[in-house]
Design a protein with these regions (language model features):
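Short, well-ordered beta-strand elements within core beta-sheets of diverse protein domains
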Residues: 9-16, 91-95, 207-214
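Enzymes and membrane/adaptor proteins characterized by extended Gly/Ser/Thr/Asp/Glu-rich
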Residues: 66-103
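An N-terminal boundary/leader segment
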Residues: 1-50, 285-287
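Residue-level signal for inorganic ion chemistry
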Residues: 28, 48, 100, 219, ...
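Acyltransferase
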Residues: 21-26, 53, 243-244, 268-294
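A short helix-breaking turn/cap at a secondary-structure junction
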Residues: 188-274
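Short glycine/serine-rich loop segments
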Residues: 100-101, 105-226
């Protein structure tokens, strides 16, 4: 079976009966077991295969859910009923969730398959994924480099192709930074957009659960499913959830800003600055409007 980087491509082949969902899950479990980057703490073999068989039954009668067959892994601070969750700390060793996070319930409801839990910095406090009771995570792009953190396992797993989408949590960069380190896409939703129910908290007034994937389309689709008001989280927004997967991606209408003080900072590595400027030119050539903005309080 080939490695998929797009859920749309995977779903097309699944719907064409080129393989079963159970075969797909077994393919990913085997690939996870062969990995040496330590991104996975545990695979949920029994429940994942059970979910896959249910999806296969539904597909046999042409019942399609929005995320049927999407292979998802979750950071080890997100609860999934009956499964282990430790926030990568020995303090919680052996603990099993007594309920599922709202994001997990919504994913499963729409046909996603939760294949396992992912390594992170202990209690999500870190930026290199070296502070875990399960040991450090290696960056699949370069095993001698860190994957970033605290959602390092979430970013590394997607980068290596061990799952199509992962969930991480972000307080001050813990989705965005490891996604950048591992060459994938990570999104921290606006606070209150996604329910925090079932997330082991780090800083409750900043924490947000968000997706990591290989492309914007998969990010949009998952965000569409996990967003929305939740009676179990009083801080969740009651605003209507946009149809993110149908948003207009017309480049000429998109404006991108970057902070000039960051790119001109004396502490910035010259190679990073050069590549950043090349990316700005690339975006401009693609039709985006890219402009600098000032943030003079950066040093404080």
């Amino acid at each position: 079976m080939k490695l998929f980087r797009s859920f749309k491509n995977l779903q097309n082949e699944l719907y064409s009966s080129n393989f079963t969902c159970e075969e797909l899950v077994n393919f990913y479990i085997k690939k996870i077991n062969q990995s040496t980057n330590n991104s996975f703490i545990e695979t949920f073999n029994d429940s994942a295969i059970s979910q896959a068989r249910l999806i296969d039954q539904e597909l046999s009668v042409k019942k399609h859910r929005k995320l049927s067959g999407l292979i998802v892994a979750i950071k080890d601070n997100i609860c999934y009923e009956g499964h282990g969750v430790t926030a990568s700390s020995s303090i919680l060793d052996g603990f099993k969730s007594v309920y599922s996070a709202t994001v997990v319930s919504r994913l499963v409801e729409h046909g996603a398959i939760i294949i396992g839990r992912l390594n992170c910095d202990e209690f999500a406090m870190g930026s290199s994924n070296e502070k875990s009771t399960y040991g450090p995570v290696k960056n699949p792009v370069d095993p001698n480099k860190v994957p970033g953190g605290s959602s390092g396992g979430s970013a590394a797993a997607v980068s290596e192709g061990l799952c199509l989408v992962s969930l991480g949590s972000d307080t001050g960069g813990s989705i965005r930074q490891p996604a950048a380190f591992c060459g994938v896409i990570g999104l921290k939703p606006t606070y209150s957009r996604v329910s925090r129910y079932g997330l082991i908290a780090y800083a409750s007034s900043f924490d947000q659960i968000g997706p990591i994937a290989n492309n914007i389309e998969d990010i949009a689709l998952v965000l569409e499913v996990i967003s929305g008001k939740d009676r179990n989280d009083s801080t969740s927004s009651s605003l209507e959830v946009p149809n993110y997967s149908k948003l207009n991606f017309n480049k000429s209408s998109k404006k991108i800003a970057y902070i000039s003080e960051c790119i001109n900072h004396k502490g910035l590595d010259p190679e990073i600055k050069q590549n950043f400027l090349l990316k700005i030119n690339e975006l401009k050539n693609q039709g985006f409007l890219v402009e600098p903005i000032s943030f003079p309080l950066l040093d404080y």
